[in-house]
């Protein structure tokens, strides 16, 4: 099977690292392509950046998505996930949802350890969106900006490990979800520093979930929430809108 892993930011080095992690998690016979949108923010640490990135994700899916058996959105806010499911013909998985659902199978309660504190309320909203407030012990920030992880992975591992230990000791977390796609490179060191506590990388979780969905022949439900878009006039000539017109039929096309 072929899987498309979309890093919603435009930092190529991060996309390359995400791709390596996805390939390491993939089973035999699974081909991974990791891509970034051609436009958008260099990193995602706020609502405005997330909104831009969500639109860029839809752009990538509209142009490339039909060439794959499944799609992963590799940012922990899962930007554009629900909209992506509407326009995609194949299953779409977000790394946050995948990792949290996996955490719920190996632990009673989990904590998310993420980047700067500004992101914490955003991820608390994500937890609530997925109906997991009772299973989430906490969302904890660190001093790390997203792009700091690659610049100094040793310091990043230390900060994530320290905050994970606090989540276990103070919040009674039983599993740790790494709350940034770039943290996959830290998984082994963080896991080795915790005693018997599962550490879940969202990129790996999303790849395995997609492999399962594709293997079982399961696609996105077209009842209610994720129905394909109905006929709608799209105004403008931007390239993104041109790509999206192939997914959202014009009213005249369905008369």
Residue ranges: model-predicted function:
Residues 1-56, 115-152, 250-251:
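N-terminal glycine-rich anion-binding loop in soluble enzyme alpha/beta folds
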Residues 2, 21, 27-49, 67-68, ...:
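C-terminal alpha-helical cap/extension of soluble enzyme domains
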Residues 13, 104-142, 155-158, 212-255:
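Short, glycine-/small-residue-rich phosphate/pyrophosphate-handling segment
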Residues 28, 87-90, 106, 135, ...:
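Short, structured coil segments at secondary-structure junctions
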Residues 46-66, 155-163:
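Glycine-rich, highly charged phosphate/nucleotide-binding loops
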Residues 54-108, 112-113:
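Glycine/small-residue-rich loop that forms an oxyanion/phosphate-binding "nest" at active or ligand-binding sites
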Residues 90-97, 134-139, 196-203, 220:
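Short hydrophobic/aromatic-enriched beta-strand-loop microsegments
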Residues 124-181, 187-189:
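Active-site rim beta-loop-alpha module in soluble metabolic enzymes
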């Amino acid at each position: 099977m072929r899987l498309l892993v979309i890093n919603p930011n435009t930092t190529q080095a991060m996309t390359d690292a995400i791709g390596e992690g996805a390939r390491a998690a993939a089973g035999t016979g699974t081909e991974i392509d990791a891509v970034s949108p051609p436009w958008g923010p260099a990193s995602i640490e706020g609502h405005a950046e997330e909104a831009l990135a969500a639109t860029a994700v839809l752009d990538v899916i509209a142009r490339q998505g039909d060439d794959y058996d499944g799609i992963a959105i590799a940012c922990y806010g899962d930007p554009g996930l629900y909209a992506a499911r509407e326009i995609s013909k194949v299953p779409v998985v977000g790394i946050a949802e995948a990792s949290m659902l996996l955490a719920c199978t190996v632990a009673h309660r989990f904590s998310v350890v993420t980047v700067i504190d500004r992101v914490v309320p955003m991820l608390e909203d994500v937890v609530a969106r997925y109906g997991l407030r009772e299973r989430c012990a906490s969302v904890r920030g660190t001093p790390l900006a997203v792009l700091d992880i690659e610049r100094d992975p040793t310091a990043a591992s230390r900060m994530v490990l320290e905050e994970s230990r606090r989540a276990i000791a103070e919040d009674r977390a039983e599993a740790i979800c790494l709350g940034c796609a770039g943290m996959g490179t830290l998984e082994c060191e963080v896991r080795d520093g915790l005693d018997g506590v599962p550490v879940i990388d969202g990129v790996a979780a999303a790849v395995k979930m997609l492999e399962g969905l594709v293997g079982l022949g399961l696609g996105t439900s077209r009842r209610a929430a994720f129905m394909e878009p109905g006929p709608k006039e799209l105004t403008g000539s931007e390239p993104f809108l041109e790509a999206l017109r192939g997914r959202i039929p014009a009213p005249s096309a369905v008369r």
